[in-house]
Design a protein with these regions (language model features):
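A structural boundary/capping signal
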Residues: 1-105
């Protein structure tokens, strides 16, 4: 399972440095095609979720996005970062994430 969700959504969040209402989220979702958990990243702004993974530009209501991905997956927390917090972690770790957990795949 390989995608670019951490990098794609990381790039978006750092483009929003002056807007703390955007949050970069790292968590675990369930892949619809095989029913198995995977590490994932997305953007939240209030009740809107945006996902720029794999060249897409998805926008859904948060409740629907979480429902489709079965988020939060039992035993896995959703971590949320402001643009500044995300940028600081990117610099400190020298990677896009995840930073606080080891996803199942």
């Amino acid at each position: 399972m390989a995608g670019d969700c951490y990098q794609a959504n990381g790039n978006f969040i750092i483009s929003q440095m002056n807007d703390k209402t955007f949050k970069l989220c790292h968590g675990v979702a369930i892949l619809a095609t095989d029913g198995r958990p995977f590490g994932h990243a997305w953007i939240e702004k209030g009740n809107l979720v945006m996902d720029f993974s794999n060249g897409k530009n998805k926008a859904l209501h948060k409740k629907k996005y979480y429902e489709l991905g079965k988020i939060p997956v039992k035993g896995h927390k959703v971590y949320k970062y402001t643009p500044k917090e995300a940028a600081m972690r990117m610099v400190k770790t020298k990677h896009w994430g995840p930073w606080e957990s080891k996803p199942p795949r």
